[in-house]
Amino acid sequence: MPARLEVYYRETVVPKLMERFKYKSIMMVPRLEKISVNIGVGEAAQEPKLLETAMQELGQITGQKPQVRKAKKAISNFKLREGQAIGCRVTLRRKIMFEFMDRFISVAVPRIRDFRGLSDTSFDGRGNYNVGIREQIIFPEIDIDKVPRINGMDISFVTSAKTDEEAYELLSLLGMPFKKKNQ
């Protein structure tokens, strides 16, 4: 059974985008290709247990086993050696991606403190959107009492859109709560 947001995309979003941008074929309509969730734990160089808890939390949030990310080069000021584990990442595709985005938009984002909308300036010029989250406890899968340290995370929404305008329209039609243009 397809995810709720995936069905909504096919039945509602695609026709609206075809009408708005005058696409001749359904294959020209931008689509969400993947979502990448990354947690950087710089302190893992001194305390490896922090990386383990971050990986466990990321696994709970996404439902997928995280991949360990290692330092590309040594930086002595940060007491960091090349090849040292300093973060974790998950790449979500297809059904799991739509389910995560649905939970992110409808459950997690409304739990952000003093939330007034996501910034619409975080597009990269190629139709991809990046958002930084300051606390992992906005996700209901995380038990606040068992969190030893508040971690932030970076979430990248990779789309097949050619321009930022197309990507903005796609994500806003999918329900992404952007700030109003006049604010």
Curated annotation (Swiss-Prot):
The keyword RNA-binding applies. GO terms for biological process: translation. It comes from the Bacteria. The keyword rRNA-binding applies. Keywords: Ribonucleoprotein, Ribosomal protein, RNA-binding, rRNA-binding, tRNA-binding. One of its GO terms (cellular component) is ribosome. SUPFAM superfamilies: RL5-like. Gene3D superfamilies: 3.30.1440.10. One of its GO terms (molecular function) is tRNA binding. Pfam families: Ribosomal_L5, Ribosomal_L5_C. Belongs to the universal ribosomal protein uL5 family. This is one of the proteins that bind and probably mediate the attachment of the 5S RNA into the large ribosomal subunit, where it forms part of the central protuberance. In the 70S ribosome it contacts protein S13 of the 30S subunit (bridge B1b), connecting the 2 subunits; this bridge is implicated in subunit movement. Contacts the P site tRNA; the 5S rRNA and some of its associated proteins might help stabilize positioning of ribosome-bound tRNAs. Part of the 50S ribosomal subunit; part of the 5S rRNA/L5/L18/L25 subcomplex. Contacts the 5S rRNA and the P site tRNA. Forms a bridge to the 30S subunit in the 70S ribosome. This is Large ribosomal subunit protein uL5.
